Amino acid sequence: MAQQSQFDADVIIVGGGPAGSTLGNLLGTYGVRTLILEREPDIIDYPRAVGMDDEALRAFQTTGLAEPLLKDMIQNTLLRYHHSNGKMFAEVGPKAKPFGWPRRNLFIQPLSEKVIRSGIARFSHITVLTGHEVETFTQDSEGVTLNVK
């Protein structure tokens, strides 16, 4: 017989990668009881993204994670875009900080993801379960039931 567990949460986030963990931090900041279910047992050790802009840093400012994230970033970097033939077609040079944060920032995703995920540990009302994959869910007037393996 399959093991059954019950969690009382206002929000369930399926996926604890950068987006899900960021949402978890935002919900944690506002006191929302949250369950995060992540299929992978740990943070994936290769990057899938490399850049973060000032708008993203504003969201992380809300969670208190902007400064820790900046420690591992190359800030306010010049970006050059090239065609497949090697010819440059655009150059973006960030000069201003209209929102108070550097505009173009390069990062190593696994490092940033560790900061974001560790931020969740500040909140006793957030539960993160890694190595748990949602197979199906049903919703009725009583709530949501997930089948998780």
Residue ranges and their predicted role:
Residues 30, 122-123:
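Conserved dinucleotide-binding and phosphotransfer motif residues
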Residues 10, 33-35, 127:
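Structural signature of beta-strand start/N-cap positions in the alpha/beta core
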Residues 138-149:
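Conserved beta-strand-loop-beta-strand element in the redox core of flavoprotein oxidoreductases
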Residues 3-19:
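Beta1/beta-strand and adjacent pyrophosphate-binding region of the FAD-binding site
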Residues 28-49:
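Glycine-rich FAD pyrophosphate-binding loop
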Residues 15-18, 39, 109:
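Glycine-rich Rossmann-fold phosphate-binding loop(s) that bind the pyrophosphate
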Residues 45-121, 129, 135-138:
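Active-site-adjacent segment of FAD-dependent monooxygenases/related oxidoreductases
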